[in-house]
Amino acid sequence: MSEEEVHDTSSEASEVFTNQPNAFVRGVRSIFGYRKTSLTLFVILTIVVTAGLSFYDNSLELTIELPTSQLEKEILESSWLDLQNIARYPHTYGSRANDQVHDYLEEIIQDMEYDNDGEKIMFESGKGVVSYYESNNLLVRVNGSDGTLPALLLSAHYDSVPSSFGVTDDGMGVASLLGVLRFVAHNQPRRTIIFNFNNNEEFGLFGAHAFVKHPWFKQVGYFLNLEGTGAGGKAVLFRGTDYGIVKNFGGVRYPYATSIFQQGFNNHVIHSETDYKVYKEAGLRGLDLAFYKPRDKYHTGEDNIRNVSPKSLWHMMSNAIDFVQMGVVDDSEEPAVYTTFLGYFFATPISALARVNLVLLVLFPVVSTPLLFVIVKYKKWKLRVTNFLGVPLAMGLAVAVGQVGNPMLVSSHPMMVVATTTSIVVLVYYVVLNGVDWVNTSSDQKLVTMIEVSFVYWVVLVYVTWSGGDHTGEFGVTVLFFVQASTSLLGLIGWTFTRVRGGDEPLLSGEEERYGTEDERDTEKPLVEHNYDWSLQYLLIVPVSSLVVYNSGWLVLEGVNKTVQESLASEHLIYWIVVVFSQFLVLPVVPFITKFNRYIVLGLSVVVVVGVLMSMAVHPFNQGSPMKLRFIERVGQNDMVEVYGRQGFVEDVLSDLPSVKQTQAKLECEALPDGLEVCKYKSGLTPGNLTVEVTTEPRAESYGLISGAITIAAPENRMCTVHFPPDRVKAVVVGKFGNNFKAIPDGFSREKGNYIYKDRNGISQLELYKLDWNKDYHVGFEWLPDIDDEGGMRVEVECFWGDMVPAYQEVVHYSPNWVTWANKERGLVGVVKHVDV
């Protein structure tokens, strides 16, 4: 080798060495270059941060602090003791324990201005159903310093269902009211506060209905209702009547809220109701604050003091204490959109969000369409129809195959079900989009996918905006569309500023300078790992979108996943929620999904295999997440115990009961609509001396209508129901009334101490609730005879008792630990009598 050659070689080596980037540049390239390893790092960090922030945001232990001031410490200690005393026994309206709770509360408030409400009301509580109710609410009034302000009503109910100790539903609400009462006794509020410790909420919201008829109701302008539909945890702002009152919730110390649950009520996804409904319909403005999970312990013996903590009680109580100190309320009565994150509260009127949505829906298509035209026409961005087939094809396939086989598993293992479904969805997108990427030679298929995902969000946002005020929980779609469409728009703008090289000059290569990440298979394009636009796109889209979807979706799923066992319709709804949740979890990362490395794909495949195997092998219920069965014993011509639940579970539970095996009682199971079944058996465990005697009184006829009356004698009883043939009875009266129904106006009326209700469309059921345990019911009615009978009518009377009965004690004691029990009717035992009038 000559000296010149040696010199040239050493010069080239020196030039290569000097052109090597330094360590910092190499580090930046290794992290932010569009490499599979870099993307894997970003994805893992996103999962960890999203799950961590969501866990912290929803954690009771990490976000709520116990009181430090001496007064608040004493208030919490006293209220916790109150809760222990209130929830010592089940205390349904039809039990002696209910009276004990009433007397306990009355003793606490006796030194204040209070009223032992004795309202008697009668109203139509359902289609063809009339209810008569004798109230014993306890009302307390604390006068405020500014008498010009409308009063604030604080409400909670002190009854439970017969199958539950009523700790969360609604002992925590009652104890919180007592805590607020002690606080305002030391700190006079600005506005007058009226406390309604109401009774018999569970079977018809009767205590709230009674308060609406009370003279103090006229003072009230606003309300805060405290409830519980789970067993402990954090108390969430369920719903609010309007933006003006909702925004005051931002002043509490530990706000926790989402209007997603409000939409659930509005769209009838959540079927249970609270006193909020009565107060809102009566014209008041206010909030519903409630515990919301887990619903499998709701109305069961697991709603007990062991499953809650003082910190849960303090969360509800402290927010109530802060809320009662609110000032002037805004006049805005629009529906509110609201949420919290990391203790920060956000609320806006639905109209403001609708205006933002409309701007976004119009702005992005108007701006992006011309840009796309310019890029395709003048910047030589080669697009085919196949470029746009990937996302819709993958989305359809993912919906078709993305369900776990065991339909009940989501009740006990929601995280596993979501992880499995999401992994399936990711793998489907990975396979389909890689196939599309292989077929197409288009550069920046990633940007095409971003535009497609933006269009999906655009369609959803159109639906949300068009749906109006009932869709206050879908505010997250606005965020998802904004970040996705903005990033897509930036990508299009980047393309418009690229230079196109090429032409007829022979010295030009004919190549094009392209914007965006290139395809590795095109060796003439810049190296993929030296493109950094992807990292900006990822950071703009994925972290925010993932957090919004995960936090909202998980909150919803935790609130409703237990309802999968309530009906087939609920099962379908829950799995629809899981599929939608999984789809929206995956959509933000879809533009980058083709760059997933083999370790991510392998990990997702393992999750799918494990999830599918678990769905086949794992029992869907366990001690921590039990199945709820409903119980009623009916005593009459055929004394039977009836147990209701999902098909395929009830018979196995009952067949192992000692009374069933010893008496060789035959289990009669019957399929019911909506995936339910009822199993009946004769129990040798009698409920004791429960008697119902029904006597008839002479009937009379006037203008073709027949009137008659019955007397119901049911010792130690508070609850009975009279069933009439459909559409025949036109008027009912509680009390002793004459036969002149013709002069009575339609609807409710009261005459000579009698409570009368008239409905020409027909009354099929009369519910009776009284306070005197041994007083007889006197019921009169007027009916229209059938043409083919002699004017007689058969009436069914059923009276309920809420105290423990031997057959119920047996099923609780001997059933598997993956079963919990709730009442089917207003009592645990019902005595049925028939009488011909």
Curated annotation (Swiss-Prot):
According to its UniProt record, the EC number is 3.4.-.-
Q: Which GO terms describe its cellular component?
A: vacuolar membrane
In terms of InterPro entries, this protein maps to: Fxna-like_M28_dom, M28_fam, Peptidase_M28, PFF1_C, PFF1_TM
Site positions (Transition state stabilizer): Y298
For the keyword Protein biosynthesis, the answer is no
Enumerate the transmembrane spans.
37-57, 356-376, 385-405, 416-436, 447-467, 475-495, 540-560, 573-593, 599-619
Keywords, A to Z, come to: Glycoprotein, Hydrolase, Membrane, Metal-binding, Metalloprotease, Protease, Transmembrane, Transmembrane helix, Vacuole, Zinc
Give me the residues that bind Zn(2+) 2, please: D169, E202, H299
Tell me the membrane topology, using the record's own terms.
Multi-pass membrane protein
A Pfam family this chain is assigned to: PFF1_TM
What residues form the catalytic site here?
A: E201
Q: Where does Zn(2+) 1 bind?
A: H157, D169, E227
Cytoplasmic-side segments: 1-36, 377-384, 437-446, 496-539, 594-598
Using the UniProt annotation, give the residues that carry a glycan (glycosylation sites).
N143, N561, N689
List the stretches on the Vacuolar face of the membrane: 58-355, 406-415, 468-474, 561-572, 620-837
The similarity annotation says: Belongs to the peptidase M28 family.
Q: What does this protein do?
A: May be involved in vacuolar sorting and osmoregulation.
Name of protein: Vacuolar membrane protease
